[in-house]
């Protein structure tokens, strides 16, 4: 074979090329932007069969690599060729592709027609190599980098993909193939077998019709995800496998059976469920993607198209909850990176807010997932919602910033009107005044603001609750092993302190129920209740377990507790009920002081009912209140009340009685010691207040334990859980009106931890059946 060496010159595109049968190695000059070669990205080709061994794998891959013309490559930092990246090229004029402007220079070559390149390990036993050296080298670099990369399939791994901006971490350049190499790729039988139908158009673009009719079958087999930008590359003979290995693609005559078998291997080799879903979806998505011309200004060019496709797939799976939970949606949409913004845009495209008012659109959006996370994360999610609402309603005169302002205002209004905060609720005039000049320097329409205010006031915003969060909610029923039986328990929220909740048995014994009129006299820690909340309100009271429920409707066994009933519920553990002798405006009034020192006044229909309520509340508290914890030890002189446990005691009645007696002796001793050090003259007002507070606490505790001991001793002496017998015994001892014996509401008392001796205990059978 005659060989001819031609000088290599750089010239503009479109210059004539000359054919020659010989190949000579040329050294590739480095990129002008100074990008260093990445270590460990080299690959070598050895053996007469064209066997390639890629670094990072143990499995050889065979088959020719044919580069497509017009291919746009996007490489991450560090993928530029080094000094050892030689390129095999014909003895013709060619153009060196660089990221900077091209400069014409002569590149000397050395004739090497039959010998292989020692650095690339290429042996030339006489058969021609149809691959362009420039493209083959870059394909080997890309394959090696892709093998070292990680397949991004899960929600967490996608976070890594979006850590850096695409524009900051990529060096983009275009490398269209020369007409000579294009002609060789079309004429070669190996290349034709690898290309299949529709993979290379007449102009060198990636075909848009490369569906399942080609030799390679599904476009899935030409889809290789990069570790940074998920570039979609045309890979003619290799099949991407999620675990990092490759399988040989079918040859020139691969059938449909082989294609299906290879695809099954792909899906079965994936270890992540979400990755399998992503691979199975890529057939329909990538088959319609068209290649871009060199120099295209499409914003999805140079690797961004792969990221956009990944964001679209993830958004679809988040919307349909395929492999994700509802709580994962807000966590992904609320992140502050470019990829999460792409995902949010694709996710919001599933919602159509056309023709909806802002409050209705917001309700629809919030029902899809729970809006969780920190304030800035939730604000980002609402920003995406506002943008989508403006896209669906282009005729709305309000700007996107104005819609976002109104959305945040509605969220705050919902919290103010329907939250557990104590204080005066926001009025409509205050809502309008708070939004003055926030519509791009102008005011919102008052009719619009009034409509939105009334909508939120009449119907609060509700969003979806995740299944895991539902188990932890205040109204979720769970099974709790207690004693010898299984009880249904719920989380009862104390309206005075929303941060403390206690499990209560729904099938607990009902000790008394009847009509009571309530007045709130003091809030937590004895603070005076504001005047606007001191009014008398009539309720139907139910003493069930250690909870006093105040219902607006009459008590029924088959009726479930509403949210309002739970808000008004009062826990009577460590509480003390007495006659309100210092209150003379109404008759038959009892005073209830709870463990957190809240004070309530209740008016009963008659004196007998008042005394019955006092007896049963105190008796339940005496039997079921757990022993108090020791007081905290501190160097501060400020007095602090000890924490009283809200759980049910595990002691029997005799042990409970001894515990109360020991506590009474301790409190009595502390009170005597406290009174041995009276106030000194000239004592500061703050110290005097601390002294009086401690004395008041010890006096109250002494009175409470005396009442507990008296009632519990009578109950043990009677030897029955029949509350009528206990009331009669107490009336005889105290010489009170015997009419106390004629109460007819739940006349029995039973312990949750021991056998019931009385036969008149009433149980909430409907709750136990559920």
Swiss-Prot record:
It is found in: Cell membrane; Cell projection, Ruffle membrane; Cleavage furrow. It is a single-pass membrane protein. Belongs to the PSD family. Residues 32-45 have a biased composition (Polar residues). Residues 1-65, 181-304, 738-770 are annotated as: Disordered. GO terms for cellular component: cleavage furrow; dendrite; glutamatergic synapse; neuronal cell body; postsynapse; ruffle membrane. Residues 650-677 form a coiled coil. The lineage of its organism: Eukaryota, Metazoa, Chordata, Craniata, Vertebrata. Its main location: membrane. This is PH and SEC7 domain-containing protein 2. One of its GO terms (molecular function) is phospholipid binding. Residues 256-459 form the SEC7 domain. Gene3D superfamilies: Arf Nucleotide-binding Site Opener,domain 2, Pleckstrin-homology domain (PH domain)/Phosphotyrosine-binding domain (PTB). Residues 1-24 have a biased composition (Basic and acidic residues).
């Amino acid at each position: 074979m005659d060989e001819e060496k031609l000088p290599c010159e750089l010239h503009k595109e479109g210059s004539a090329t000359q054919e020659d049968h010989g190949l000579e190695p040329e050294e590739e000059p480095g990129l002008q932007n100074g990008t260093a070669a990445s270590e460990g990205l080299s690959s070598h080709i050895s053996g007469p069969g064209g066997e390639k061994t890629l670094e990072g794998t143990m499995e050889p891959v065979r088959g020719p690599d044919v580069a497509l013309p017009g291919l746009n490559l996007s490489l991450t930092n560090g993928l530029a060729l080094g000094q050892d990246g030689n390129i095999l090229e014909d003895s013709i004029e060619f153009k060196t592709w660089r990221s900077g402007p091209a400069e014409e220079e002569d590149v000397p070559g050395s004739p090497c027609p039959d010998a292989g390149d020692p650095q690339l390990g290429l042996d030339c036993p006489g058969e021609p190599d149809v691959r362009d050296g420039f493209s083959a080298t870059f394909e080997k670099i890309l394959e090696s980098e892709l093998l070292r990369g990680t397949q991004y399939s899960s929600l967490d791994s996608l976070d890594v993909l979006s850590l850096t901006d695409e524009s900051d971490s990529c060096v983009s350049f275009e490398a269209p193939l020369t007409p000579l190499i294009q002609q060789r790729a079309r004429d070669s039988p190996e290349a034709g077998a690898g290309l299949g139908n529709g993979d290379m158009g007449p102009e060198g673009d990636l075909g848009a019709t490369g569906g399942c009719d080609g030799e390679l079958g599904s476009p899935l087999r030409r889809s290789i995800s990069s570790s940074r930008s998920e570039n979609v590359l045309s890979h003619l003979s290799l099949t991407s496998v999620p675990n990092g290995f490759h399988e040989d693609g079918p040859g020139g005559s691969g059938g449909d059976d082989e294609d299906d078998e290879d695809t099954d291997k792909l899906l079965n080799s994936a270890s992540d469920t979400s990755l399998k879903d992503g691979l199975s979806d890529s057939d329909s998505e990538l088959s319609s993607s068209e290649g871009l011309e060199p120099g295209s200004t499409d914003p999805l060019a140079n690797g961004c198209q792969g990221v956009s496709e990944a964001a679209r797939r993830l958004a679809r799976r988040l919307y349909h909850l395929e492999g994700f939970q509802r709580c994962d949606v807000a966590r992904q949409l609320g992140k502050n990176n470019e990829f999460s913004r792409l995902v949010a845009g694709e996710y919001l495209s599933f919602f159509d807010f056309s023709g909806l008012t802002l409050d209705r659109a917001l309700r629809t959006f919030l029902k899809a997932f729970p809006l969780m996370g920190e304030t800035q994360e939730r604000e980002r999610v609402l920003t995406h919602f506002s943008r989508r609402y403006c896209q669906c309603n282009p005729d709305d005169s309000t700007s996107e910033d104005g819609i976002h302002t109104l959305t945040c205002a509605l969220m705050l209004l919902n919290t103010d009107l329907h939250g557990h905060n104590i204080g005066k609720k926001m009025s409509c005039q205050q809502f309008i005044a708070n939004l003055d000049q926030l519509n791009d320097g102008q005011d919102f329409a008052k009719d619009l603001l009034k409509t939105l205010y009334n909508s939120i006031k009449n119907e609060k915003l509700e969003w979806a609750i995740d299944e895991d969060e539902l188990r932890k909610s205040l109204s979720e029923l769970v099974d709790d092993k207690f004693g010898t039986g299984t009880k249904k328990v719920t989380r009862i929220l104390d309206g005075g302190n929303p941060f403390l909740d206690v499990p209560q048995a729904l099938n607990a014994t009902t000790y008394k129920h009847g009509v009571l009129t309530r007045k709130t006299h003091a809030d937590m820690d004895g603070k005076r209740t504001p005047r606007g909340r001191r009014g008398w309100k009539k309720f139907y009271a139910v003493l069930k377990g250690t909870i006093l429920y105040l219902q607006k409707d009459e008590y029924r066994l088959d009726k479930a507790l509403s949210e309002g009933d739970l808000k008004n519920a009062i826990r009577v553990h460590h509480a003390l009920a007495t006659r309100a002798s210092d209150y003379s405006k109404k008759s038959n009034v009892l005073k209830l002081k709870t463990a957190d020192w809240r004070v309530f006044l209740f008016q009963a229909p008659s004196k007998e009912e008042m005394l019955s309520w006092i007896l049963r509340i105190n008796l339940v508290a005496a039997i079921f209140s757990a022993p108090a914890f020791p007081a905290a030890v501190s160097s501060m002189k400020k007095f602090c009340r000890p924490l009283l446990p809200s759980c049910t005691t595990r002691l029997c009645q005799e042990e409970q009685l001894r515990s109360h007696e020991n506590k009474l002796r301790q409190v009595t001793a502390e009170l005597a010691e406290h009174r041995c050090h009276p106030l000194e003259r000239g004592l500061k007002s703050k110290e005097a207040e601390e002294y009086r507070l401690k004395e008041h606490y010890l006096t109250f505790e002494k009175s409470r334990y005396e009442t507990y001991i008296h009632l519990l001793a009578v109950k043990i002496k009677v030897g029955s859980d029949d509350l009528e017998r206990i009331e009669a015994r107490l009336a005889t001892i105290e010489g009170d009106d015997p009419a106390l014996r004629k109460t007819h509401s739940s006349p029995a008392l039973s312990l949750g931890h021991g056998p019931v001796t009385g036969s008149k205990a009433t149980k909430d059978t409907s709750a136990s059946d559920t």
